[in-house]
Amino acid sequence: MNDVTVVNCPTCNKQVIWDELSTWRPFCSKRCQLIDLGEWAAEEKRIPSSGDLNDSDDWSEQPLDRQ
């Protein structure tokens, strides 16, 4: 069985074969990878959240005991 997985590049929608030889997968090229990274760095893309945390919210970490 020789199933070939093909995905679309998230940046330009060019088809990319998903295997070890596809260096930039899921992107088709280093250029498309850097365009995507730049969009994240410029905060054009983000992971949705339920809201911002503020100092009064409960945190999962324990406060440091500074003595």
UniProtKB/Swiss-Prot annotation:
Extract the NCBIfam families matched here: PRK00418.1 (NF001638)
Source domain of life: Bacteria
**Its gene?**
yacG
Keyword Glycoprotein (UniProt):
no
- Co-factor note (free text): Binds 1 zinc ion.
Q: Enumerate the cofactors the protein uses.
A: Zn(2+)
Summarize subunit and interaction data from the UniProt record for this chain: Interacts with GyrB.
Q: Name one GO biological process term.
A: regulation of DNA-templated transcription
The residues that the entry says bind Zn(2+) are 9, 12, 28, 32
Q: What job does the chain carry out? A: Inhibits all the catalytic activities of DNA gyrase by preventing its interaction with DNA. Acts by binding directly to the C-terminal domain of GyrB, which probably disrupts DNA binding by the gyrase.
Q: What is the name listed in the Swiss-Prot or TrEMBL entry for this protein?
A: DNA gyrase inhibitor YacG
Q: Which family does it belong to?
A: Belongs to the DNA gyrase inhibitor YacG family.
Q: Which organism is it from?
A: Erwinia tasmaniensis (strain DSM 17950 / CFBP 7177 / CIP 109463 / NCPPB 4357 / Et1/99)
